[in-house]
A protein has these predicted regions:
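Extracytoplasmic
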Residues: 16-50, 241-246
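Extracytoplasmic gate region of multi-pass secondary transporters
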Residues: 35-36, 220-275
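Helix-breaking motifs and short loop linkers at transmembrane-helix boundaries and internal kinks
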Residues: 47, 78, 99-104, 133, ...
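Central cavity-lining transmembrane alpha-helices of secondary-active solute carriers
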Residues: 57-72, 265-277
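Conserved MFS/SLC helix-loop-helix module at the cytosolic interface between two early adjacent transmembrane helices
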Residues: 66-101, 282-288
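Cytoplasmic helix-loop-helix junction between adjacent transmembrane helices
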Residues: 109-146
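Glycine-rich segments within core transmembrane alpha-helices of 12-TM secondary carriers
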Residues: 136-164, 179, 349-363
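Symmetry-related core transmembrane helices of the 12-TM Major Facilitator Superfamily/SLC fold
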Residues: 170-187, 378-395
Length: 419
C-alpha cells in the first residue's frame, strides 16, 4: 500500500481540502460524461441519424469555449467562489436535458452544461496545485483523477434506466441532481486557497506608483504554446482511441454490448492503479522521466491493441492503460505549475479548450479515414505518433518541476505573503 500513498504527510488542512475536492470531482465528471452515454438513446427517440449524432457531439465539444470567461473570473474573484458556483450550476443546467422536446434542445443544454463541468474540473486541479505541498502535487491530482472516474462511472451506472422505455434516458439526467448534495457541502466547507488570498492582499496594496509583479503577471506565452501543442497532440490520439473503441469492438470483433462493458471495465481498473503509483513516482523521482517513457509506450500499446484479437488485444489495452495512467499525474500537474497565480486558471482553460477542439478535429479525420476503409490499426498507430512527439517535446522543452515551489517556477509570485 505504501506505493499508493503520498511521498510526504499531508497537513490537516491539506487532507480536508483534498477530501472536498475529491467530492467536487464527482459532479464534474458526471456532467462531462452523461451526454456521451445517453446520446444514442436520445437520438433514437428523436429519429436522429448517426451523422446528426456526430455533428451534435462536435457542437457539445466545441462549447468548451464557454469555460474561458469562467476561468478569467476564477483568477479575478477567487477559486472558491467559482468552484461553488459551478458545483451548483453544472448539474442543474445539464439536468434540463431531461425536459428536452427535441434533440436540438438537448444539445443546447449540454453545450452549456458540459463546459460548466469542464470549468469545475479545471478549477479543482488549480486549487489542488496551489494547496498541496511541493512533494505531493502530482499525487493529489492522481487521487482526484480516481474521483473523476467514480463520477463518470455513476453516469455509466445509471445507464440501465435508459433501457426502461424509449424516453427513459431522461431519468439519467435527473440522477445528476443528486450531486447537488456535494454543492451544499462545498458551500459550507471549502476555504479559499492561501495563494489567492495572498494575491488579493497584493491587489489591495496596488497604487498608481506601486505595481506588484504578482498582480500584473502575464501568461508565459512560450509555456502556453508548448502546452497547447502537447495537449492537442495527446488528445487527438486519446479522444480517437476512446471514442472509436466501442465501434471497433462492436463492428470488427463482434462484441455484444455486455462484452464491450466488460472489456471497458477490465481494461480501465488497472489504469486507476497506474494513476496512484504514477502520482507518487512523479513527486518522488520527477515528472519528465516518467512522462517521456510512459506516454509514447502507452499510446503505441493501445494502438497495437487494434491490430490484435483474443487475449493479446486485452493484454495490450491493459498495459497501455496502465502506462497512460502512470503518465497522467505528471502531465496534468504541469498545466497549473508553470503559470503564475494571477493567470493559473485562464491558462489551464486555454490549454483545455485547445485540447478538446484539437481532439474533435482528430475524430473527424479518423472517421473519414475509417470510412475510406483504412484499418483501425493503421489509423490508431498513425495518431499514436502524436504522443511520441509529445515525449520529444517534454524531454527537450519542459522544465523539471518536482521538489520545486510554485514561486520558484513563477518568480513573479515570489513576493506573495502566503500564510
Amino acid at each position: 500500500m505504501r506505493g499508493f500513498m503520498a511521498s510526504e504527510p499531508l497537513t490537516l488542512r491539506q487532507r480536508n481540502v483534498l477530501r472536498l475536492l475529491w467530492l467536487a470531482c464527482l459532479p464534474a465528471s458526471f456532467v462531462n460524461t452523461v451526454f456521451t452515454q445517453t446520446a444514442t438513446y436520445a437520438a433514437a427517440e428523436f429519429n436522429v441519424s448517426e451523422r446528426g449524432q456526430g455533428f451534435a457531439a462536435a457542437i457539445v465539444r466545441w462549447g468548451v469555449v464557454i469555460a474561458l470567461p469562467f476561468a478569467f473570473s476564477a483568477d479575478r474573484f477567487g477559486r472558491r467562489k467559482m468552484i461553488v458556483a459551478m458545483s451548483w450550476l453544472a448539474p442543474i443546467v445539464v439536468s434540463l436535458g431531461a425536459l428536452s422536446p427535441s434533440f436540438g434542445f438537448l444539445v443546447a443544454t449540454q453545450t452549456i452544461g458540459r463546459p460548466l463541468g469542464i470549468s469545475l474540473s479545471i478549477f479543482i486541479v488549480v486549487f489542488a496545485t496551489e494547496e498541496m505541498g511541493t512533494n505531493t502535487r502530482a499525487w493529489a491530482l492522481s487521487v482526484l483523477a480516481v474521483g473523476s472516474g467514480v463520477g463518470a462511472g455513476s453516469a455509466v451506472g445509471a445507464l440501465p434506466l435508459a433501457g426502461i422505455s424509449d424516453t427513459s434516458w431522461r431519468y439519467v439526467y435527473i440522477v445528476g441532481l443528486l450531486w447537488l448534495v456535494v454543492a451544499v457541502v462545498l458551500t459550507r466547507s471549502l476555504p479559499e486557497t492561501k495563494r489567492f488570498i495572498a494575491l488579493q492582499h497584493q491587489q489591495h496594496e496596488e497604487t498608481p506608483s506601486h505595481h506588484s509583479a504578482a498582480v500584473s503577471a502575464h501568461i508565459h506565452r512560450d509555456r502556453l504554446w508548448l502546452q497547447i501543442a502537447v495537449a492537442v497532440l495527446t488528445n487527438i490520439f486519446i479522444a480517437t482511441a476512446s471514442v472509436f473503441q466501442i465501434r471497433y469492438l462492436k463492428d470488427v470483433r463482434d462484441y455484444s454490448a455486455s462484452l464491450v462493458a466488460v472489456f471497458t471495465t477490465i481494461t480501465a481498473i488497472p489504469a486507476s492503479f497506474g494513476l496512484m503509483i504514477g502520482g507518487r513516482i512523479a513527486d518522488q523521482r520527477g515528472r519528465k522521466n516518467l512522462a517521456i517513457v510512459t506516454i509514447p509506450l502507452g499510446a503505441v500499446l493501445i494502438a497495437t491493441s487494434y491490430g490484435f484479437a483474443s487475449y493479446m488485444m486485452w493484454l495490450t489495452a491493459i498495459l497501455g492503460g496502465i502506462c497512460l495512467g502512470l503518465a497522467y499525474p505528471a502531465m496534468a500537474v504541469f498545466r497549473s505549475e508553470l503559470f503564475p497565480t494571477a493567470k493559473r486558471n485562464i491558462a489551464s482553460a486555454i490549454i483545455t479548450t485547445a485540447s478538446l477542439i484539437g481532439g474533435s478535429i482528430g475524430l473527424i479525420g479518423a472517421g473519414l479515414l475509417l470510412d475510406h476503409d483504412v484499418s483501425y490499426a493503421t489509423v490508431m498507430m498513425g495518431f499514436a505518433m502524436g504522443p511520441v512527439l509529445v515525449a520529444v517535446l517534454v524531454f527537450t522543452k519542459y522544465p523539471e518541476t518536482a521538489h520545486r515551489k510554485l514561486e520558484e517556477l513563477n518568480p513573479e509570485d515570489s513576493l506573495l505573503q502566503i500564510l
